[in-house]
């Protein structure tokens, strides 16, 4: 492609509202342009990268017998109502009405559509297993779109769905998809770590996220420094090691703590450690209230609370709800004397606490010498806190460390979450109707583009891996007015294209400095510069990844490039 005939609007200045390096560089290099908040146009270079990522996806999907199709982005409300998610998905689901007042959603995901489709078309176990996938734009009304393509309101996604007659079949496809995803990201050149994750609004149980390691990642990964264990911090189990105390329980004592509401204030006022305090947090779980206790130096993990209670929605109680339910303000809440309408759940570390400090459910007062087994009615002890750096790894090997990551893919075992709700059944060998077992597998294609840019750049610009680069080669003719340079550049352009290379040819009437700067910014794997030695048949070849430059005869150019 001649650069004079395409659209690559590079920028010299960093856009003021671009936080992430990938966002800055994709804008500066002319890959994307913002239409509105969280919505972008993919310029010619970006779209070629997207197509290369999609081709890798298609090749890996074909290897595991997944079949491509395309479903509608506009989805009727009735289908979502069947699954129940119309009422629980939240404001991220973009809803609209047609001229007749009928309700629709713009597809944030396609479980409902694919389940209803397969329900109507597949009736026998003989047609299972079946894996279908699509690559399509998705829509989510993000509260705060940011980081360019990493968190947008419209994005390109590959989503696959598998249907099975047995758990063994689902497990087999899940493992194949897991390996295919690992291959996809490796081929795209991304440093990705698969981690144990939460299924969230998707439902189901077993799930893994593929996290591209990045300092600007919005997810925290907890990993072992001595093993392969890795999990999203929301799902990382805490390996509880109870240490018996030889301290004798003391009598409960109420103390005056004027305006002392936080753990930090409490430890300073009473001269105790955070480990000796009980943090009590009131949650609303669907239509009931529960009190959750953790040690003062720990934080409540609301995902673990949600999973323990099998709740659809778990939210912190409001200031008014705390007063209404417990008769006191936040900051003085505790487990002693809670009425039976509010169930109390405690983290496993609380069970071993002796003579702890906790709120007295009375303004400006706390209790000392709280022993929950004696003084409170605990419904259940469980792992309810976030893991911390320095905790032992849940697999018993090594210590937990943290890293930041960008989620670029996720695989789920949905089980019968959707098939039972939507009556998607098949007839088994005995002619009995059974709910289909389902798997769901997603890759953020546009997010993957951004993650590659986030991991592959330097101070001069982008550095695209060869597998996804928009072009293989970048030819620069430094002086288009010089007949020798122009003619040699034209010949190389034609010859290298004929050899099967994707070539971007900078034939613009620009200064050499502009061409070099744009070339580094765009970041194609190999640059061929036709300059002052063109009459000698000598060109400069620069490898973008290493920065190494070599002057070489055009007769040896093809052989040299093929080895890179």
Swiss-Prot record:
InterPro entries tied to this protein: aa-tRNA-synt_IIb, aa-tRNA-synth_II, aa-tRNA-synth_II/BPL/LPL, Anticodon-bd, Anticodon-bd_dom_sf, Pro-tRNA-ligase_IIa, Pro-tRNA-synth_IIa_bac-type, Pro-tRNA-Synthase_IIa_type1
NCBIfam families named among the record's database cross-references: PRK09194.1, proS_fam_II
Q: How does it assemble?
A: Homodimer.
Q: Which reaction does it catalyse?
A: tRNA(Pro) + L-proline + ATP = L-prolyl-tRNA(Pro) + AMP + diphosphate
Name the major location: cytoplasm
Know the name of this protein? Proline--tRNA ligase
Task: Give compartment(s).
Answer: Cytoplasm
**What GO biological process terms are annotated to this protein in UniProt?**
prolyl-tRNA aminoacylation
Top-rank taxon? Bacteria
Against PROSITE patterns, the record matches this protein to: AA_TRNA_LIGASE_II
Q: State the GO CC annotations.
A: cytosol
| HAMAP family the record matches | Pro_tRNA_synth_type1
Q: Name one GO molecular function term.
A: ATP binding
Functional description taken from the UniProt entry: Catalyzes the attachment of proline to tRNA(Pro) in a two-step reaction: proline is first activated by ATP to form Pro-AMP and then transferred to the acceptor end of tRNA(Pro). As ProRS can inadvertently accommodate and process non-cognate amino acids such as alanine and cysteine, to avoid such errors it has two additional distinct editing activities against alanine. One activity is designated as 'pretransfer' editing and involves the tRNA(Pro)-independent hydrolysis of activated Ala-AMP.
Q: Which UniProt keywords apply?
A: Aminoacyl-tRNA synthetase, ATP-binding, Cytoplasm, Ligase, Nucleotide-binding, Protein biosynthesis
- Domains: entry comment: Consists of three domains: the N-terminal catalytic domain, the editing domain and the C-terminal anticodon-binding domain.
Q: Which PANTHER family match?
A: MITOCHONDRIAL RIBOSOME PROTEIN L39/PROLYL-TRNA LIGASE FAMILY MEMBER (PTHR42753), PROLINE--TRNA LIGASE (PTHR42753:SF2)
Q: Which E.C. number(s) belong to this protein?
A: 6.1.1.15
What is stated as this protein's family in its record?
Answer: Belongs to the class-II aminoacyl-tRNA synthetase family. ProS type 1 subfamily.
